[in-house]
């Protein structure tokens, strides 16, 4: 039965982190490129949903905003985000033209649709900087506002590039050309699935009507502009938490081809130092309990 299959999938997801579940129908309903093909599958990490065919292999060029570097006194610096995203979109668009393509089908797809994916990493770090719990209404509000800012300026940057370099070849007929943004396409899903399943906050803090008018006038350089990648490697290189994920362990060992190295939650270390609790005993306790704080009685509940 379907319920048993669904329960088994969720159990496996809870126990192992796999399989990653993505709903194909919803992806196609909201795809800005539904006029040129069908989304048959996603990539391994499921942040990319692009149409494919016998003549096209989907390719997407990714970049991630280091969110903690855009925090100022516990507040997101929107002007800095704007500058970063604007520069990043230009660089990602350049990658499409100068990239090496091992097969022509990938080159055809990338040049025809020019998708790029701006994402972020260090979301949990940004919450730490605000002393905000991940599981809180304040965290949800910050997620809404930070993603709105990145999305807004990513679309604006792509439209600026379209004015400078021209729209992507398959632009005509896309949802973009109809004035429908990704945030608007949830209404398409709502009409298909029913409003009772889509009770989500759709409040705005930026002038989206002005941006729609700009896109209608100048077009878009890229068919897609947003993608939240896992950033498993680059986040470790830059010393921030992965993507939009919470800290799942305060201390763990990561392995790669270079060997093994220990990852420690630096914010926990700072807090413990501030409480005069950071000593050799605490270090050994954290190692023994594999980063868990629940078994260490010296640490206050708050």
What do these predicted regions represent?
Residues 1-302:
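Long, C-terminal-biased catalytic regions of enzyme "large/alpha" subunits
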């Amino acid at each position: 039965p379907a319920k048993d299959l669904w329960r088994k999938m969720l159990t496996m997801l809870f126990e192992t982190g796999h399989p990653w579940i993505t709903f194909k129908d919803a992806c196609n309903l909201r795809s800005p490129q539904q006029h040129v093909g069908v989304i048959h599958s996603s990539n391994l990490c499921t942040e990319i949903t692009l149409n494919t065919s016998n003549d096209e292999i989907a390719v997407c060029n990714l970049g991630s905003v280091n969110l903690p570097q855009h925090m100022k006194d516990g507040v997101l610096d929107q002007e800095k985000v704007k500058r970063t995203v604007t520069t990043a979109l230009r660089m990602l668009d350049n990658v499409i033209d100068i990239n090496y393509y091992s097969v022509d089908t990938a080159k055809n797809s990338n040049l025809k649709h020019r998708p790029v994916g701006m994402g972020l990493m260090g979301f949990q770090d940004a919450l730490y900087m605000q002393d905000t719990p991940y599981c809180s209404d304040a965290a949800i509000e910050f997620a809404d506002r930070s993603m709105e800012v990145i999305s807004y300026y990513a679309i604006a940057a792509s439209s600026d590039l379209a004015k400078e370099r021209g729209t992507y070849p398959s632009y005509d007929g896309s949802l973009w050309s109809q004035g429908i943004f990704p945030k608007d396409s949830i209404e398409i899903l709502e009409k298909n699935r029913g409003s009772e399943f889509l009770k989500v906050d759709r409040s705005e803090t930026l002038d989206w009507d002005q941006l729609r008018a700009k896109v209608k006038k100048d077009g878009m350089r890229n068919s897609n502009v947003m993608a939240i990648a896992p950033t498993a490697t680059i986040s470790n290189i830059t010393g921030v938490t992965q993507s939009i994920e919470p800290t799942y362990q305060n201390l763990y060992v990561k392995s790669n081809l270079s060997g093994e190295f220990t990852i420690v939650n630096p914010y926990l270390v700072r807090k413990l130092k501030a409480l005069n609790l950071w000593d050799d005993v605490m270090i050994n306790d954290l190692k023994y309990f594999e980063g868990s704080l629940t078994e260490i009685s010296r640490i206050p509940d708050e």
